[in-house]
UniProtKB/Swiss-Prot annotation:
Enzyme class: oxidoreductase
Gene: SODCP
Binding residues for Zn(2+): 111, 119, 128, 131
List of residues binding Cu cation: 94, 96, 111, 168
InterPro entries assigned: SOD-like_Cu/Zn_dom_sf, SOD_Cu/Zn_/chaperone, SOD_Cu/Zn_BS, SOD_Cu_Zn_dom
Protein name (database record): Superoxide dismutase [Cu-Zn], chloroplastic
Transit peptide per record: 1-48
Classification via Pfam families: Sod_Cu
Length: 202
């Protein structure tokens, strides 16, 4: 294929032209054209999309609360918890399989467990994805906590959106209590309040 020459407005000697090629086409570029082409290049920046969800917990007792979940790109999910009306002490806190509260919190089903493992602590390798451990209520019955977990994403096949968060009556034994329910529920007792996880604007 014949060479193509870009000519600048001012006369240039033949030795001042630069030669390059692309797609089989030979192109002679004047130095100022080459500088212009490279100096205007800006790298592509990909901005990660943050996601946010909320769950409003209600029950048949005075226990209630609000939980927010946020996730940046594909990173872990940060869960901010504030629940009131609890008895002082530890209470199991889990993500359950279903966002169904038609018959109260019992309709939310078992813990969210896509990997079909036994119950454990949040830091355990073998655990339910929905095992979020315990929250601690103070003398006024208020529990505030921040949980960071990488098994409860807000998007993808294991998204927690549409599932339910549940706070329990008793302390979760984290699968280590030796009770017949330890490896399924942590023997955390009844379900005091629950709420469906739904997306909200960031």
């Amino acid at each position: 294929m014949a060479s193509q020459t870009l000519v600048s407005p001012s006369p240039l000697s033949s030795h001042s032209l630069l030669r390059t090629s692309f797609s089989g086409v030979s192109v002679k570029l004047a130095p100022q054209f080459s500088t212009l082409a490279t100096s205007n290049f800006k790298p592509l920046t990909v901005v990660a999309a943050a996601k946010k969800a909320v769950s409003v917990l209600k029950g048949t007792s005075a226990v209630e609360g609000v939980v927010t979940l946020t996730q940046d790109d594909e990173g872990p999910t940060t869960v901010n918890v504030r629940i009131t009306g609890l008895t002082p002490g530890l209470h199991g806190f889990h993500l359950h399989e279903y966002g169904d509260t038609t018959n109260g919190c019992i309709s939310t089903g078992p813990h969210f467990n896509p990997n079909k493992l036994t119950h454990g602590a949040p830091e355990d390798e073998i655990r339910h994805a929905g095992d979020l451990g315990n929250i601690v209520a103070n003398a006024e019955g208020v529990a505030e906590a921040t949980i960071v977990d990488n098994q409860i994403p807000l998007t993808g096949p294991n998204s927690v959106v549409g599932r339910a968060l549940v706070v329990h009556e008793l302390q979760d034994d984290l699968g280590k209590g030796g009770h017949e329910l330890s490896l399924s529920t942590g023997n955390a007792g009844g379900r005091l309040a629950c709420g469906v996880v739904g997306l909200t604007p960031v």
